């Protein structure tokens, strides 16, 4: 994938809010990318502090955002390294929020025979990027209308999020994936460097799995998975960003809102 844009590597400590002095250096030959995702480096650090009424829709009625285009450097890299997700049990990922800010109401565990093998509206994976301590961190997050396991007893709950943070050397001409930190049962499981058996070209392969009576979590796998339509945080509408903050989904909140996102970067930092 050809890139001529250069980034200015920034060292920052990120105590919880973005450093708005971060920027990309754009050569004249790539000025068409002047939209350079102010987003990922400015990162709209207000979503957690805004309160509004959040409406809910049935889990299979949320319309996903159109997939992001490689129209700026951040989006280009996020698409290049988008991980695959292998599903062998439980629900498939569904859209969590629509352009108006309506969120999924999820699916109760008591709905034993209700299908959750994929939304008729299409699927979605959510991304958010930030330059942290000189490395480009990209979070990929999936929403599941419920998390359940068929064991001697029926275990689970309505609404679930899983995520992984990919750590990339920099936004230079030849970005390289250095580490993957997948949210596990306890903390993060780090794959640094990622082994070739877990890679499919530039895509890291993740599995949505469970163990005994645990909740589902993410782990590396040799099995190929599927791609979902990627939407980046900064390409979402303002209403959607606010709705994915701490007000949505009660105890099973999205990892994309400011507080949880920056906490995840600190906890998953692998170097």
From Swiss-Prot:
Cellular component GO terms, alphabetical: extracellular region
Lineage top rank: taxon: Eukaryota
InterPro entries: NPP1 (IPR008701)
Signal peptide region: 1-47
The UniProt record lists the keyword Secreted: yes
Keyword Protease: no
Record keywords: Glycoprotein, Secreted, Signal, Virulence
Residue interval(s) of motif Conserved heptapeptide motif: 156-162
Subcellular location: Secreted
Chain positions of motif Conserved undecapeptide motif: 137-147
Induction behaviour: Highly expressed at multiple time points in both early and late stages almost the entire host infection process.
Chief localisation class: secreted
Residues of this chain annotated as glycosylated in UniProt: 235
Family assignment from sequence similarity: Belongs to the Necrosis inducing protein (NPP1) family.
Function: Secreted effector that acts as a pathogen-associated molecular pattern (PAMP) recognized by the plant immune system. Seems not to induce necrosis in Nicotiana benthamiana leaves but significantly improves disease resistance of Arabidopsis thaliana to Hyaloperonospora arabidopsidis and causes an inhibition of plant growth which is typically associated with enhanced immunity when over-expressed in Arabidopsis.
Entry note about domains: The structure of NLP effectors is remarkably conserved with a high level of conservation of a central region containing the conserved undecapeptide motif AIMYAWYFPKD and heptapeptide motif GHRHDWE.
Name of the featured protein: NLP effector protein 4
Species whose genome carries this gene: Plasmopara viticola (Downy mildew of grapevine)
Higher taxonomy: Eukaryota, Sar, Stramenopiles, Oomycota, Peronosporales
Name of the gene this protein is made from: NLP4
